[in-house]
Every structure is written in C-alpha cells, then in structure tokens.
C-alpha cells in the first residue's frame, strides 16, 4: 500500500523527550544570547541519542546562467561560538564555488524527536589557516586521505576510479605521520544576522522566537506560527 503523505503528521506538545524543560519557548531563555541556547539544544539532542545532533542543512545560492537558484545539502557543524557556526569542506566543491560567488548562506538544525529546529542566516567567510589546521589534525586519518583523494562535486567514471584515487593517495602518504591540509580544503564561519528558534506545539500553534543580531546588539521578537 502506498504511503498516504497527506495523512502523515505529528501532534507536538508536552515536554520534549529528555529536555526536562517547559515546552513553551520563552524569551528569557535568550537572556544570554542565541549561542548558549543553541548549544543547550544540541546537548539535549545528544542526551537522547539523536544521530549526528550537530547536522545542519546548509543552503547556498547557485547562480545558473545569471539566475540565482537555491542549493542545499546536509553538513556537520564543527564549531559554535557567539561569532557563529563553523563547518569544513572542499573549497572547490559545489558549495565552495557557490559561497565564493555569493558569500551568504542559511543553516537549519532539525531534531524531530524533540520537536525543535533552529534556523540561522547570514554572511559566510573562510576561517583562518590556523583554525583549519587545528581541526584537520583532529580528523581520522581515513577522512584526511579521503579529502585528498576526492575532487568533490566533480564527475567520476566509477566507484572503482574513486577507490584507485584513494589507493594512490594512501601510497603517497605512507610513512607520513601528519598528513598536511590540502590547499583546496578548509573551514567557513557563518555569522548569523538572524537566528530563529522553533518549538512544536499542539494544534500547530508553534513557538517561534526570532533573534536579530547587529554587532553587539541583539533583539528578540515572537513570530506567529
């Protein structure tokens, strides 16, 4: 039997699993800024064993024949600070090329089990080489080799060809204790101008708080669902 997509729905409400908090998202929760609350929600998602609680959908702008088109994919947030969220990738990938042309993006964290999501939007800039190097050294060796082997987002003839590229890179760095950072690889920092916290509620009357960030100044307003 085919799935009835129109009938699929979840009745939000009550205390989110593992949160131990009132479900009613309150402006007071943002007294310390947007970053502590986002960090807290990621930690709560971790506590209830959500897979990759730091995953976020990154949306960029692809300019095709002079026309802007949306593009999105899931990446992992690898850094969180009052300045913004950090992620790493191949600078020559589709998203890297798009960010070079239009250095602005949106990122959305979604935790359905908790009935929560957070949406950030703002300009994007590359992280420093020093910051990239620190994170690179924390990556598993297999991931480092993969970053050298893959020309991300470009066509390849077969899986076998990709495996051969990995074998060549593995041989190249055999005996090398610290694999260097590829010149085409590094981090990005998304500096949010807006951060929206969303909490599901019964009857689809969800809680939405929008944080606007302008330098040291922050304002919070409640949005209708």
Curated annotation (Swiss-Prot):
SUPFAM superfamilies tied to this protein: FMN-binding split barrel
The enzyme's E.C. designation: 1.4.3.5
Entry binding sites for substrate: 9-12, 78, 135, 139, 143, 204-206
Top-level taxon: Bacteria
Cofactor note: Binds 1 FMN per subunit.
Pfam families per the UniProt record, alphabetical: PNP_phzG_C, PNPOx_N
EC class name: oxidoreductase
GO biological process: pyridoxine biosynthetic process
Keywords: Flavoprotein, FMN, Oxidoreductase, Pyridoxine biosynthesis
Binding site for FMN: 73-78, 88-89, 95, 117, 152-153, 198, 208
InterPro entries: Pyridox_Oxase (IPR000659), Pyridox_Oxase_CS (IPR019740), Pyridox_Oxase_N (IPR011576), Pyridoxamine_oxidase_dimer_C (IPR019576), Split_barrel_FMN-bd (IPR012349)
Protein's pathway: Cofactor metabolism; pyridoxal 5'-phosphate salvage; pyridoxal 5'-phosphate from pyridoxamine 5'-phosphate: step 1/1; Cofactor metabolism; pyridoxal 5'-phosphate salvage; pyridoxal 5'-phosphate from pyridoxine 5'-phosphate: step 1/1
Cofactor(s) it depends on: FMN
MF term (GO), any: pyridoxamine phosphate oxidase activity
Catalytic activity: pyridoxamine 5'-phosphate + O2 + H2O = pyridoxal 5'-phosphate + H2O2 + NH4(+); pyridoxine 5'-phosphate + O2 = pyridoxal 5'-phosphate + H2O2
PANTHER family, alphabetized: PYRIDOXINE-5'-PHOSPHATE OXIDASE, PYRIDOXINE-5-PHOSPHATE OXIDASE
Summary of subunit composition and partner proteins: Homodimer.
Biological role stated in the UniProt entry: Catalyzes the oxidation of either pyridoxine 5'-phosphate (PNP) or pyridoxamine 5'-phosphate (PMP) into pyridoxal 5'-phosphate (PLP).
This protein's name: Pyridoxine/pyridoxamine 5'-phosphate oxidase
């Amino acid at each position: 039997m085919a799935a009835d997509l129109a009938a699929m729905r979840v009745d939000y409400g009550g205390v989110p699993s593992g949160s131990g908090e009132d479900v009613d998202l309150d402006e007071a929760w943002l007294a310390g800024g947007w970053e502590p609350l986002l960090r807290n929600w990621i930690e709560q998602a971790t506590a209830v064993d959500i897979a990759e609680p730091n995953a976020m959908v990154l949306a960029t702008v692809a300019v095709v024949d002079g026309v802007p088109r949306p593009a999105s994919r899931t990446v992992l947030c690898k850094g969180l600070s009052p300045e913004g969220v950090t992620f790493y990738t191949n600078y020559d990938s589709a998203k890297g090329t798009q960010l070079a042309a239009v250095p602005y993006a949106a990122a959305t964290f979604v935790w359905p089990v908790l009935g929560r999501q957070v949406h950030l939007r703002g300009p994007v800039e590359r992280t420093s080489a020093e910051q990239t190097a620190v994170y690179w050294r924390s990556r598993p060796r297999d991931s480092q080799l993969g970053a050298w082997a893959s020309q991300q987002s470009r066509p390849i003839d077969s899986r076998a060809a990709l495996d051969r590229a990995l074998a060549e890179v593995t041989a190249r760095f055999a005996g090398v204790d610290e694999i260097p950072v590829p010149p085409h690889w590094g981090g990005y920092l998304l500096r949010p101008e807006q951060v929206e916290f969303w909490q599901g509620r019964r009857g689809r009357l969800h809680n939405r708080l929008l944080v606007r960030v302008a330098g040291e100044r922050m304002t919070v307003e409640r949005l209708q669902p």
